[in-house]
Amino acid sequence: MENTATKKKSKLCEVCNVSRPVLKRPKTGEMICKECFYTVFEDEIHHTIISNNLFKRGDRVAIGASGGKDSTVLAEIMTLLNKKYDYGLDLFLLSIDEGITGYRDDSLETVKRNQEQYQIPLKILSYKELYNWTMDDIVKEIGLKGNCTFCGVFRRQALDRGAVMLKANKIVTGHNADDIAETVLMNLLRGDIPRLQRCVNIITGSEGALPRSKPFKYTYQKEIVMYAYFKKLDYFSTECIYAPNAYRGHARDFLKDLEAVRPSIIIDIIHSAENFHFREENKMPVQRNCIQCGYICSNDICMACDLLKNLNSGLAKVKLSINLKRGKDNNNNSNNNDNNNTLKLESTSAATTTTTTVSN
């Protein structure tokens, strides 16, 4: 009789001990019911927002909205928490149309439906409008190799410009724990110490551009998918048709292999990167304004203007490989600590101090 009672008890939610569990949390391994999952998921993100002082009352916050699961859940969570905890924020949806036929045009329809559901003002800004190029045009010009370089640079600038048009003073994006762990791995594998230094920051852009925050920094992608599924949220699930050629895909596959062996690896990587201590010479360069467009950058001309110049001159395909090589060489020159091109960084914890050496 006692064994039967214990068996029945073990099948109950480990949080409320009342309802039957519907999932095992990837983040903690807890067997949890649907309502408790909603509660802990939302409470953890609220804690991240409050403990990191991401917002203050009266902020005008642009939510980067692509129509995908991350940005759709972000819109849901920001709307819900803003009302529940009276953040006092003015929220906006900001979508960037890169001009990818069969992908972005379809996902924008999802964003429009989200706008109607959440009753949040929506701004759509296109690459064509800003740069007179679409990503389809760029891929035709340069091919599939390196196209993510153009898209990443243009998208970051477009988000800032769109936020300014909305008179927003902050941007939030749906980057989750998996994304950040992947970025840490990418920067380690490339020996990109300046980017490694800032990629785990929950707020970026505070040096001049609009501050961007990541409320999902400690939120697993699998839990975001589960939240969207159980809440029956309307989101677009097709991957970008050019994404399979991105370098990030290799880091993602590597991370999945690691996670299969150690489920906590995602958070472990983030916490490890947070504890890195960098030498002074690895600091990011001083920011200034681009002499052509006025955008924040570290050179006289920002990368977006440089890429546009190459596109408009018909030399983008040739110069892309040159620029990428030059960027790698500059990174090596500014970050190498000896003549053997070895990058050194220190990781500290309360118990130990270790030195990690990454060779180019």
From Swiss-Prot:
Gene Ontology CC annotations of this record: cytosolic tRNA wobble base thiouridylase complex
Renumbered residue ranges of the record's region Disordered: 327-360
Keyword terms, alphabetized: Cytoplasm, RNA-binding, Transferase, tRNA processing, tRNA-binding
CDD domains to which the protein is assigned, alphabetical: CTU1-like (cd01713)
Protein location: Cytoplasm
Stored Pfam families: ATP_bind_3 (PF01171), zn-ribbon_14 (PF16503)
Any Gene Ontology biological process: tRNA wobble position uridine thiolation
PROSITE patterns: UPF0021
Main location: cytoplasm
GO molecular function: nucleotidyltransferase activity; tRNA binding; tRNA-uridine 2-sulfurtransferase activity
Compositionally biased tracts (Low complexity): 330-360
Annotated pathway: tRNA modification; 5-methoxycarbonylmethyl-2-thiouridine-tRNA biosynthesis
SUPFAM superfamilies xref list: Adenine nucleotide alpha hydrolases-like (SSF52402)
EC code: 2.7.7.-
HAMAP family: CTU1 (MF_03053)
UniProt function note: Plays a central role in 2-thiolation of mcm(5)S(2)U at tRNA wobble positions of tRNA(Lys), tRNA(Glu) and tRNA(Gln). Directly binds tRNAs and probably acts by catalyzing adenylation of tRNAs, an intermediate required for 2-thiolation. It is unclear whether it acts as a sulfurtransferase that transfers sulfur from thiocarboxylated urm1 onto the uridine of tRNAs at wobble position.
Family: Belongs to the TtcA family. CTU1/NCS6/ATPBD3 subfamily.
UniProt protein name: Cytoplasmic tRNA 2-thiolation protein 1
